[in-house]
Amino acid sequence: HGSFQERIFTLVGKRLWFLYQEMIAPIKKGPLNVLGQPLQPCCNKLKTGWYRNGSCETDENDHGRHVVCTVMTDKFLAFSKMAGNDLSTPMPQYQFPGLGEGDCWCLCASRWQEAFEAGMPPQVKLEYCEESALEIIDLENLQAFAVKAP
């Protein structure tokens, strides 16, 4: 139990410890893009990405790794549909309008790699691709299909 001074010191000491921990705790760094810069939203028009907030950020629950900011082409959409991932047909039950030529979308890294290997990858906006895409896709391959972000 201790004296009043001991109890006060214990309380103040604990508070100082917590303040110290807050001061030295590293500032949480937001997600980075494949260029090592802060990740920016891929699309404001469509609700894309794992979080459906327009950004290609991810977490450990995103098994598909929706981290590649792509610009749709009719060629890629046809390939994707043929491969079993129909991105062009609207699905109102999921609030999905369907994608068309020129739409941006956070694509699964493995799907982009599959399309790349088939010679059909969509273009990408490097500034908006989350860095973990590099665990699956070579940066040089992304750069070869990069378009300038607005």
Q: Can you annotate each of these PLM segments?
A:
Residues V71-D86:
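Short, basic/aromatic beta-hairpin or loop at an interaction surface
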Residues W112-E135:
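Short, compositionally biased
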Residues I24-K75, A146-K148:
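Extended boundary segments
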Residues E131-P150:
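Glycine- and charge-enriched low-complexity intrinsically disordered segments
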Residues S88-Q95:
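Short alpha-helix capping/helix-loop boundary micro-motifs
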